[in-house]
Amino acid sequence: MADPEKIIKVSVVTPDGIVYSHNATMVAMRAIDGDRAIMYDHLPIVTPLAIGEVRVKRTHEMNDRIDHIAVNGGYIEFSNNEATIIADSAERARNIDVKRAQSAKKRAEQHMQEAKEKHNEREMLEAEIALRRAVNRLHVRENYGK
């Protein structure tokens, strides 16, 4: 069990409200410049996040538990042992609707094909981002959503 004196507070917030809020010993995520992990007494930081998975290692009764959250970009701010992730959208693994994510993936693939045929770079980029978001949600749900 973690030292109760070395705990950080982790919150994930979207425009719809708080998606996640727990005490933890570590939070790990993919920033746009690479993977990061933050623990107790880390220096203050603000950094943009890539589309990816956030892992929160928290204490749960007598053993550690890792929560997984699919995040579609945003940023993390850490200071005074509080980590706040602000994202356009985020979902805990257990809450991801697989059918919705699969539909989003299929739509993104169709949009990519249409953009390719029209030689529209902007639409192609938008479709690629939508595809990465859908694939991220599916990955997090399929691997950690039990």
From Swiss-Prot:
Pfam families: ATP-synt_DE (PF00401), ATP-synt_DE_N (PF02823). It comes from the Bacteria. Residues 103-122 are annotated as: Disordered. InterPro entries: ATP_F1_dsu/esu_C_sf, ATP_synth_F1_dsu/esu, ATP_synth_F1_dsu/esu_N, ATP_synth_F1_esu_C, ATPsynth_dsu/esu_N. It is found in: Cell membrane. One of its GO terms (molecular function) is proton-transporting ATP synthase activity, rotational mechanism. The keyword Cell membrane applies. The keyword Transport applies. It is a peripheral membrane protein. One of its GO terms (cellular component) is proton-transporting ATP synthase complex. SUPFAM superfamilies: Epsilon subunit of F1F0-ATP synthase C-terminal domain, Epsilon subunit of F1F0-ATP synthase N-terminal domain. Its main location: membrane. Keywords: ATP synthesis, Cell membrane, CF(1), Hydrogen ion transport, Ion transport, Membrane, Transport. Transmembrane segments: none annotated. CDD domains: F1-ATPase_delta. Produces ATP from ADP in the presence of a proton gradient across the membrane. F-type ATPases have 2 components, CF(1) - the catalytic core - and CF(0) - the membrane proton channel. CF(1) has five subunits: alpha(3), beta(3), gamma(1), delta(1), epsilon(1). CF(0) has three main subunits: a, b and c. Belongs to the ATPase epsilon chain family. This is ATP synthase epsilon chain. The lineage of its organism: Bacteria, Bacillati, Bacillota, Bacilli, Lactobacillales. The gene is atpC.
